[in-house]
Amino acid sequence: MAVANSSPVNPVVFFDVSIGGQEVGRMKIELFADVVPKTAENFRQFCTGEFRKDGVPIGYKGSTFHRVIKDFMIQGGDFVNGDGTGVASIYRGPFADENFKLRHSAPGLLSMANSGPSTNGCQFFITCSKCDWLDGKHVVFGKIIDGLLVMRKIEFQAPLGKRVQAWTHSLTCPALTGILALILMPTE
């Protein structure tokens, strides 16, 4: 399946984004709970802070976008180590690839970052273009439904092939679930 059709039962999360201290907008993301419920729920709970470890909420608040590659993807969600090596999930460790029904067929798709089969955790990426070579390797579990231009603003912070580091900070989330703000700084 190329891209799942929107469903009114699917949760929507959002990222409020700022670059260099300037607010650039909001990305609303529908999570495909109707196709990949386990994967969508893992992400949703890390967005809302519902998941707790030793009574303390853990999730994307304060995490980084550690990879931004123009014409490919923006990757983040490693709130464990902040560098792309951390793994955590609401299931207490890496979890299996739920299914590969959805394809990396367009920009704006949310997919699990992993280090091989069935190593899903907290890390995710958003496609900046069609990435069909990732099909069957990474689980697509959401799509930007509003704010694709904001994703492009993040993407264009990275010179070709270079990484951009981004710190995320919590903002209030009035009606939807989930929050992130980005402050991008080039790294070498």
From Swiss-Prot:
Gene Ontology terms, MF aspect: peptidyl-prolyl cis-trans isomerase activity
Activation/inhibition comment: Inhibited by cyclosporin A.
Main location: nucleus
Sequence positions bearing N-acetylalanine: 2
Keyword Acetylation: yes
Ranges where the PPIase cyclophilin-type domain occurs: 14-176
Keyword annotations from UniProtKB, A to Z: Acetylation, Chaperone, Cytoplasm, Isomerase, mRNA processing, mRNA splicing, Nucleus, Rotamase, Spliceosome
Record-listed E.C. numbers: 5.2.1.8
Locations listed in the record: Nucleus speckle; Cytoplasm
Enzyme class: isomerase
Catalytic activity: [protein]-peptidylproline (omega=180) = [protein]-peptidylproline (omega=0)
Pfam families given in the database record: Pro_isomerase
SUPFAM superfamilies, sorted: Cyclophilin-like (SSF50891)
Keyword Transit peptide: no
GO annotation (BP), single: RNA splicing
GO cellular component, one term: spliceosomal complex
InterPro entries xrefs: Cyclophilin-like_dom_sf, Cyclophilin-type_PPIase_CS, Cyclophilin-type_PPIase_dom
Subunit structure: Interacts directly with PRPF4. Part of a heteromeric complex containing PPIH, PRPF3 and PRPF4 that is stable in the absence of RNA. Component of the U4/U6-U5 tri-snRNP complex composed of the U4, U6 and U5 snRNAs and at least PRPF3, PRPF4, PRPF6, PRPF8, PRPF31, SNRNP200, TXNL4A, SNRNP40, DDX23, CD2BP2, PPIH, SNU13, EFTUD2, SART1 and USP39. Heterodimer with PRPF18. Heterodimer with PRPF18.
Biological role stated in the UniProt entry: PPIase that catalyzes the cis-trans isomerization of proline imidic peptide bonds in oligopeptides and may therefore assist protein folding. Participates in pre-mRNA splicing. May play a role in the assembly of the U4/U5/U6 tri-snRNP complex, one of the building blocks of the spliceosome. May act as a chaperone.
Annotated family: Belongs to the cyclophilin-type PPIase family. PPIase H subfamily.
Protein name (Swiss-Prot/TrEMBL): Peptidyl-prolyl cis-trans isomerase H
Species per Swiss-Prot/TrEMBL record: Mus musculus (Mouse)
Taxonomic lineage: Eukaryota, Metazoa, Chordata, Craniata, Vertebrata
